[in-house]
Amino acid sequence: ASAASRMVTAAGGPGSDGRPLIEMGSRRTHEWAGVAAARAAYIAGFASTSNLQARLSYGVPSSGTSAHAFTLVHDEERDAFRAQLTSLGHDTTLLVDTFNVEQAVRDAVELAGPSLGAVRIDSGDLPAHAVSVRALLDSLGAKDTRIILTGDLDEYSIAGLAVAPVDGYGVGTSLVTGSGAPTAALVYKLVARSDTPTADDEALDYRRLVSVAKRSVGKPGRGGRKWAVRERSASGDASTERILLAPPTELGPEDRVLLHELVRGGKIIGREPLADARSRHAAALADLPSYALQLSRGYPAIPTVFGTNDEEA
């Protein structure tokens, strides 16, 4: 609640004088803690939450937007926009930074018309994007279309955006963690989808999966289903972790495939006894070279290389 209050103040204060904030932090905390955070944020002046349970439990107004995965699961960005507009109407908020912001804004206005509700920008130079997108929207006749910014915002970055032509913010991580606490910026990123509308085993064969990836500045993705192999040096120590875009076919005698099936059809199949897990951890540590155990910030224990054999992914 304290973090939310600071953010509301940084955004200009509660009510009509400030820019509205949407609480979007449920994916960063326990599911019921997310509901509690949404309630606390609303008390502190947030306008709404993306958590539907908070609406059901406490009557907190709900709002939201689409995810990058929604765009990536479509063949074209325009297809994703068209589907969202058909389902939610022209007052919806379209996410425009999956590939190219300028082209996405043009497509969004072309499909929705000047009555488009809002566009959301989640990456890149947010102040610069806000200025250029505002100018572009105005030139296309969408002068009432709002600009919503998201992307690891906190009270300090919100204050820094005070002079940018922005209409609102979405805040997640910094809100639900109380702001100022260390966090791991780990999120779900869609990297591949089936080339058929079915989800049977044949459709999920890696050779039939379509590689997809976000290409926005600052948050690019690396598309494709992946396999990981830990390679060993001549001395027997783990030397490299190689990420492949196809099942490994040329393994050294001591190389180890790292991926193992744990869940199949929604059922856990890979659970191991506690003693076995403890032994496996000890064996994995013994594989590492001595320098990998140094506590040095910014250096990997062992390097990760992308590519199949000599071909980079």
Q: Over which residues does each language-model region extend?
A:
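Contiguous mid-protein beta-loop-alpha structural module that forms a pocket-lining wall or clamp
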Residues: 148
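Buried, small/hydrophobic-residue-enriched core segments of structured protein domains
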Residues: 1-143, 155-160, 164-165, 177, ...
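Gly/Ser/Thr/Ala-enriched C-terminal appendages of enzymes
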Residues: 140, 145, 154-313
